[in-house]
Curated annotation (Swiss-Prot):
Modified residues (N6-(pyridoxal phosphate)lysine): 228
UniProt: (6S)-5,6,7,8-tetrahydrofolate binding residues: 119, 123-125
Annotated function: Catalyzes the reversible interconversion of serine and glycine with tetrahydrofolate (THF) serving as the one-carbon carrier. This reaction serves as the major source of one-carbon groups required for the biosynthesis of purines, thymidylate, methionine, and other important biomolecules. Also exhibits THF-independent aldolase activity toward beta-hydroxyamino acids, producing glycine and aldehydes, via a retro-aldol mechanism.
GO molecular function, one term: glycine hydroxymethyltransferase activity
Matches recorded under PROSITE patterns: SHMT
Cysteines engaged in disulfide bonds, as pairs: none
Positions marked as site (Plays an important role in substrate specificity): 227
Name this polypeptide is given: Serine hydroxymethyltransferase
Cofactor: pyridoxal 5'-phosphate
Keyword annotations from UniProtKB, A to Z: Amino-acid biosynthesis, Cytoplasm, One-carbon metabolism, Pyridoxal phosphate, Transferase
Length: 419
């Protein structure tokens, strides 16, 4: 096995990898942006394709010897187009942020106006945050959620679009638990002659399985990561229903912001897209949402407030102000108990961003491990018990023991699965 070669060559790095395997096996990952890639995905990513330089695109490379990496990339492109019903796909972005950067460079000029979701309301850094390239190079305005419902204020989106007439509107979020109305976003964009870009990084797996409406028919361009709910390698993806956008988008990836593509990662993306085209993947995504709704219901029954009152997708955002616990304190205590999640600002949060008033909770990893609704009731109880006894070491240690038992019953990889 590859890990054996690593242990012989570099015991220090092998030790870190081995300890991470143990951490993943014996802790419950509730981070909404994480998942467990299959062994096949990891095999492709750890293959000899890492040795090959291949600047350019299939059939149009700047290096010789690319005939087989061309095949791998074309498989990834074709599968991505089939999976999402797109006319165009670029599988070369190294990350979701670089996919967004390339799209912005294709559609905007420095100083142009964009409209995106406020980071404090669930958006993403690359949707115009002033600390991101997006906010530094472009003039972004931001929409948010309604205070009374926690759902996107589409009237505000329309008003801001009418007032500022952005050249581009971006829909998508990193901490929004409800279904996005892509048709409404498209109507607003059309009303001001703006391009609509959808960043579906968090919900790509749900979209692929038909569990969440697809943005592809409504958006000019769609970006995504290939991990998260899609359960592939870490990387980025650009899609469009408009084949005529292809040339402009391609040149912004290469030579615009990247040189040689990561062919081993592209091969792993191809494997992940192939897995996502199976009936088993559809069933998996359906269970992800069932688990999220079950977990949300059990948390609310036990007094935990959730932004928007629940979830439609793979995540929920808990507002802990009613139990006087900060997101930072919750993250620390839950991690000690073997429950890994992340502190997260909630809409209209008054806490420091490094402290926050909430936590983000997701079900993709638990679902990959094979857990279903009965386990969500157990996990909800464990979470609430820690949150309500946050300084009680006895409770935290007892919870840790129960988490270990649950993890043993649902290993991250089974001998008879694709992991």
């Amino acid at each position: 096995m590859i890990i054996d070669y690593l242990a012989q060559q570099d015991p220090e790095v092998a030790g870190a990898v081995a300890r991470e395997v143990e951490r993943q096996q014996h802790n419950l990952e509730l981070i909404a942006s994480e998942n467990i890639a299959s062994r096949a995905v990891m095999a492709a990513q750890g293959s000899v394709l890492t040795n090959k330089y291949a600047e350019g695109y299939p059939g149009k490379r700047y290096y010789g010897g690319c005939e087989y990496v061309d095949q791998a990339e074309q498989i990834a492109i074709d599968r991505a187009k089939t999976l999402f019903g797109a006319a165009y796909a670029n599988v070369q972005p190294h990350s979701g942020s670089q996919a967004n950067m390339a799209v912005y460079f294709a559609l905007l000029s420095p100083g142009d106006t964009g409209l995106g979701m406020d980071l404090a309301h669930g958006g993403h850094l690359t949707h115009g945050s002033p600390v991101s390239f997006s906010g530094r190079l472009f003039d972004f305005k931001h929409y948010g959620v309604k205070k009374e419902t926690g759902t996107i204020d589409y009237d505000q989106v329309a008003d801001l679009a009418k007032t500022h007439r952005p050249k581009m509107i971006i829909a998508g979020a990193s901490a929004y638990p409800r279904t996005l109305d892509f048709e409404k976003f498209a109507q607003i964009a059309a009303s001001v002659e703006a391009c609509l870009v959808v960043d579906m990084a968090h919900i790509a797996g749900l979209v692929a399985a038909g569990v969440h409406p697809s943005p592809v028919p409504h958006a000019d361009v769609v970006t995504s990561t290939t991990h998260k709910t899609l359960r592939g390698p870490r990387g980025g993806l650009i899609l469009s229903a408009r084949a005529d956008f292809g040339k402009a988008l391609n040149k912004e990836i290469f030579p615009g912001i990247q040189g040689g593509p990561l062919m081993h990662v592209i091969a792993a993306k191809a494997v992940a897209f192939g897995e996502a085209l199976t009936d088993g993947f559809v069933a998996y995504q359906q269970q992800v949402v069932k688990n999220a709704r079950a977990l949300a219901a059990h948390l609310m029954e036990q007094g935990i407030e959730l932004v928007s009152g629940g979830t439609d997708n793979h995540m929920m955002l808990a507002d802990l102000r009613n139990i006087s616990v900060t997101g930072k304190a919750a993250e620390t205590a839950l991690e000690r108990a073997g429950l890994t999640l992340n502190k997260n600002a909630v809409p209209f949060d008054t806490e420091n961003p490094t402290v926050t008033s909430g936590v983000r909770i997701g079900t993709p990893v638990m679902t990959t491990r094979g857990m279903k609704e009965p386990e969500m009731a157990v996990v909800a109880g464990l979470i609430v018990n820690v949150l309500k006894n946050i300084s009680n070491d006895t409770v935290i240690q007892a919870t840790r023991k129960r988490v270990m038992e649950l993890c043993e019953a649902f290993p991250i990889y089974r001998d008879n699965d694709n992991g």
